[in-house]
Structure formats: C-alpha cells, structure tokens
A protein has these predicted regions:
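Conserved C-terminal active-site "lid" loop/helix of NAD(P)H-dependent oxidoreductases
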Residues: 285-291, 306-336, 341-346, 350-351
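NAD(P)-dependent short-chain dehydrogenase/reductase
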Residues: 203-253, 260
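Adenosine-cofactor binding site in Rossmann-like domains, unifying the SAM/SAH pocket
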Residues: 91-108
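Mid/C-terminal beta-alpha module of Rossmann-like enzyme folds, strongest
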Residues: 264-312, 348
Length: 351
C-alpha cells in the first residue's frame, strides 16, 4: 500500500522499534521496583523476626535474673532465717549498720540509688516491748522514723516496700474472736502505738507499701542464727530448770513458727499496698495453748509445769488473735498459715 508515494506498511514498521524500546524500559523499571519491594519486604520480615527473637531471648534472660532484695535486719531473728532460706533464689543485699543507717534519710536514699533493689524487705526493729516502754524516743526513731525513711526512698525510686508491723497494734481492743485489719485499734503500749504510726505514715508516703502485722514467733537456734525468748524456749527452760511457768488465761494470740513466716515472705512482694495480718490463727488462750503443747512432749504432764494466771489483764481480755482471710484472698491462696497448734505439732515432729 502506498500513500503519497510512501509505503505505509514500511512507515508503520519503521515506527515499531521506538515503542518496543519504551515498553522494554518500562518493563525493566517495573521489574526493578518489584525486586526493590520484594527485597524491602524480605528485609522487614527478617528485621521483625530478628527483633522478636531478641525480645524473646531478653525475656528469658530477665526471667532467669535473680530479683534483688534489700533486707534490713538481716542478722536478726527473722532476717537471718530469710537469708538462709532464700539466698539461692534472690540476690540479697544485707548491709551492716555502717553501710545503711535507717534512721538517716540521706543514708537510706543513697544506698537505694546506688544498689537499685527491686524490693526492700524491712525487718530491722526494736521489738522488745519492755525496752520500748523504757526508751520511747529511741523506739520512735527506729520503729517509726526508720520505716518512714525507707518508705519515702522506696516510693521515689519505684521500689516495692515490705515491712513488719505487729499484732501489738491490737493490744487495747476489747472485741473477742479473730480480729481483721478493718477493726478500729488503740494500742495501749508504746511499741504498739509506734507500729501503728509507722503503718499510717509509711502508707501515706508509699501507697504500694505492704505492712505485715506479725504475731509472736518461735524457733530454736539453728546454724548459728540468733534466737530470742519465745513460747517454745520458755517452756523448754521451765522443763530444764524445773521452774513453773505462769501463763495468762485472759490472753488470746497467734503464735507462729518462724519457718512459716519466712516461707511466705516472697509471696508478699506482689501484694497490693495495704495492711495485712500475717501469722497463725489461734482460738485458744495462751495458757491452754501451752498445756496442749506440753501434751505433745512424751511423758510430760503440764500440771506441775504450767500455772494459770487469772489476774493478769483484769479490765478486759487481751485479744491479739488475728484473722488472716485478707492476705489469703489477696495472695490467691498462696499465703496460708496453719493454726498455732498445727504449726506446733509440725515443729515438734521435726525436732
């Protein structure tokens, strides 16, 4: 076919190569973009999975890292037993008085910042109630101001604060039966008043703090760990010296094996802030409890050994017996103390 003397088919054939070149160039660019996006997707996929792997490994490492616990009073009755029981499960900081003076706010702040514990377990205290009566200023400095210094520093540094209060806060209550944490209290002795003040002020400074109202505790000397006068040792001393032991009939209180106190402490590290009764429940008076314990001892009659005291606490019965329902629920059943008598039976079976 000819158009104006020119072969139209030849013209069309001559125009084809530029279009083909353009198509080829576009195809190459599309291919490059395709390869770029594929590489990008692969890179992002690898980066995602690699990041997840790093995160997973970090979680494993963190799970296997010992939690660092600052224990005050680590050389004392409860503190030494806590360290002995949990030293392989936690990284325990047990400073001396020279390293950490709890009555010095700057010393407390500096130690916590420098050592970065996750938990402060405050067990140091003046626990002799008679001594506190005779030395109220010293008792307040240690049992109140020391607690407040630790509570404030813990709050400022995001540290969980656990500290011991006492069943002595109930020393003044006239109600019968096991007492819960919600009952109004008005302690009659210096020690109990200072413990109550420490609870109130510490929780004001550090709302996530946990105050454990501990009972009277007992144990024997083990592996050089200190021991003080307690229910079991008082009876043992009476047996050894053939000296009658006079015990009140108008007193009700829980008495707890120190082993159980120490065993449940890690479970308190995750409790919501607040006050918790902490120790064995008991429905018997102190004289009756002692008589039942003596009956466990082979061939021992409690009659000549124990004498009831009906005169002590004449105005009203001294009731320090506590209900532990709150801590049982809050811990999901993890903190579950046996009764005083069941604890004594187990303790005696393991002597």
């Amino acid at each position: 076919m000819r158009c104006n003397g020119v072969d139209c088919h030849d013209e069309q054939r001559g125009a084809s190569p530029p279009y083909k070149a353009a198509h080829k160039k576009i195809a190459q660019q599309v291919s490059l973009l395709h390869d770029f996006f594929i590489c990008r997707i692969l890179y992002l996929s690898y980066f995602y999975y690699f990041s997840r792997m790093i995160l997973f490994m970090s979680e494993i490492i963190l799970d296997n890292t010992m939690q660092r616990i600052l224990v005050t009073g680590a050389g004392g009755f409860v503190g030494s037993r806590f360290v002995e029981r949990w030293r392989n499960e936690f990284e325990i900081l047990a400073p001396s008085h020279a390293e950490l003076d709890i009555t010095d706010a700057l010393s407390v702040e500096r130690y916590i910042i420098e050592n970065a514990p996750q938990v402060v377990l405050h067990l140091a205290a003046i626990s002799n109630t008679w001594y506190c009566e005779q030395h109220p200023e010293e008792s307040h400095r240690v049992n109140v101001e020391g607690v407040c210094n630790l509570a404030a520093a813990s709050a400022r540094n995001g540290v969980k604060f656990i500290f011991f209060s006492s069943d002595q806060v109930y020393n003044g209550n006239c109600e019968s039966g096991p007492l819960d944490e919600g009952v109004a209290v008005a302690p009659e002795n210096v020690y109990g008043r200072h413990k109550l003040e420490a609870e109130q002020r510490a929780l004001g400074l550090c709302p996530t703090a946990v105050a454990l109202r501990a009972t009277w505790m007992y144990d024997i000397e083990r592996d050089g760990m200190p021991v003080h006068a307690n229910f079991v040792l008082n009876i043992a001393k009476a047996i050894k010296e053939h000296a009658p032991l006079v015990l009140p009939v108008r007193e009700y209180r829980g008495i707890t094996w120190a082993r159980d106190v120490v065993e449940f402490l890690p479970a308190t590290f995750t409790l919501p802030g607040g006050v918790y009764n902490y120790g064995a429940e008991c429905s018997m008076d102190t004289y009756e409890t002692a008589c039942c314990y003596c009956e466990m001892l082979v061939g021992l009659q409690s009659g000549p050994l124990l004498q009831p005291d009906y005169e002590r606490y004449p105005e009203h019965e001294r009731n320090l017996a506590m209900s532990t329902d709150k801590i049982f629920r809050a811990s999901g059943g993890t903190v579950f103390f046996s009764t005083t008598m069941d604890g004594l039976r187990l303790f005696h079976s393991m002597l």
